[in-house]
């Protein structure tokens, strides 16, 4: 645990969400908060590809979030873009060639949805589930710039978590962290399978 001061700008973006009440409170004082480790893939064997390089980008755009949901991408404990950048450079081994592997995040959706909680006297004796966090990512890998041809694969992964109303900011971030880890783990498995099946011209087997 590390004592850190949270950036108030993130809380302003989230104004009205369940996370906002915790983050705005943290703006006023130092709070013992967990520093979350990056999600990495160095323990997995890289996929060798005959490409000159790998480039990563988020082309998903701002996206439309309909009330009562809130966009929480700016308050996640780890960055989906940074995580996929780590994935691309740790899981794809560019051996050299004429093409480039473009790893594009085409969907990057993380929202908080408020849930109805019990009100009145009964609510004083219950600990209701107060928010649901929903995440979804779609990643597309394109091989471009190779005179021999082009190719692409795509995979999507989604997950959700619900949290009770008495959860602290650290507990809420733990739920978000676990959700992101689940999403990228599934993306890793699906993308590698798609690459081996449909980008075999560039994937070096062995």
What are these regions (language model features)?
Residues 45-114:
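N-terminal segment of the mature soluble domain
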Residues 192-206:
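Short, highly charged C-terminal tails/helix-capping segments
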Residues 2-18, 22:
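N-terminal secretory signal peptides and thylakoid transit peptides that target proteins
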Residues 23-43:
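Bacterial Sec signal peptide processing site at the extreme N-terminus
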Residues 74, 149-189:
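Short secondary-structure boundary motifs at beta->alpha junctions and helix caps
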Residues 99-152:
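Surface-exposed short loop/turn segments
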Residues 21-26, 119-123:
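Surface-exposed flexible segments
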């Amino acid at each position: 645990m590390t004592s850190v001061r949270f950036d108030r700008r993130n809380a302003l973006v989230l104004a009205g969400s369940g996370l906002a009440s915790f983050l705005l409170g943290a703006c006023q004082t130092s709070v013992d908060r967990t520093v979350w480790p990056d999600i990495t893939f160095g323990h997995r064997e890289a996929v060798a590809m005959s490409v000159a390089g790998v480039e990563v980008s988020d082309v998903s755009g701002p996206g439309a979030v309909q009330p009562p949901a809130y966009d929480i991408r700016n308050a996640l404990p780890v960055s989906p873009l940074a995580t996929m950048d780590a994935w691309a450079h740790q899981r794809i081994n560019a051996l050299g060639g004429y093409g480039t592997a473009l790893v594009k995040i085409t969907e990057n959706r993380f929202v908080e949805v408020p849930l109805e909680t019990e009100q009145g006297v009964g609510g004083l004796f219950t600990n209701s589930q107060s928010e649901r966090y929903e995440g979804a990512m779609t990643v597309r890998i394109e091989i471009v710039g190779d005179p021999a041809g082009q190719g692409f694969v795509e995979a999507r992964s989604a997950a959700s978590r619900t949290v009770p109303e008495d959860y602290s900011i650290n507990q809420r971030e733990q739920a978000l962290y676990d959700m992101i880890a689940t999403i990228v783990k599934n993306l890793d498995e699906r993308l590698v399978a798609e690459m081996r099946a449909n980008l075999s011209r560039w994937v070096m087997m062995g």
